[in-house]
Amino acid sequence: FIEEGIDIVVSTKDLPGEVMLDAEIFSWYINTLHINGVSTLLSRFVNSYKGIDYSVFYEELFEFLQQDAWWVREQAEVRQYFHNWMTQGRIRHPNVGGIEIHGWNLIHRTILHMHVEERYDHVFDLLERFMARYELPEDIMANLMRFQRLYLVAYRRVREYPMQLDLDYNIWEYLTAGAELANAPVRYRLEFPEDKAMSFPRFLELFYFARRRNFGKAMVDRIT
């Protein structure tokens, strides 16, 4: 049996260890919510509709989430595991849904917990409360949240794809094609372009191994 290891930088003269940990936490946070599609449509809409920079949106959201016990626990534990890795060379993290957690996939731990614990409603309810500060028109907000909740693919629903989403606004074109926001009925087709019969552990491990193909987010096409 031969152990493998890697060398990692844990601090520099300009980035002390604690600041490095802060950077690791912010990277984990952005990966969990924005990269994985949990808050992506919300941040993009606020940027386009209100002119609020992504950095402002995510700094404000980070502070808001410090009020939630589940999120704070996740954040504290991730920080401790990063600290273990940096100071002891091993994370010593329990498996999540049967998936081993190492230094290189620790950043995915919370999105895995969201799926394992089915925290979808908890997280999206938090995001909806946060979004209230931007005072979007009520009908736009309702449409946006419906879209966001379905944009993240929940494992329990993979066999329901493709699914149809009827909205009152052309939100997808507004965010991705520079179209004017129009109040008119639209119908989207949401697809999970993967093996719909995959096991739950396979689904979870693909958040790392299929990260370059946007795994975990629905593909969107306009029907009408």
Residue ranges: model-predicted function:
Residues 48-201:
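Terminal or standalone catalytic/regulatory effector modules within metabolic enzymes
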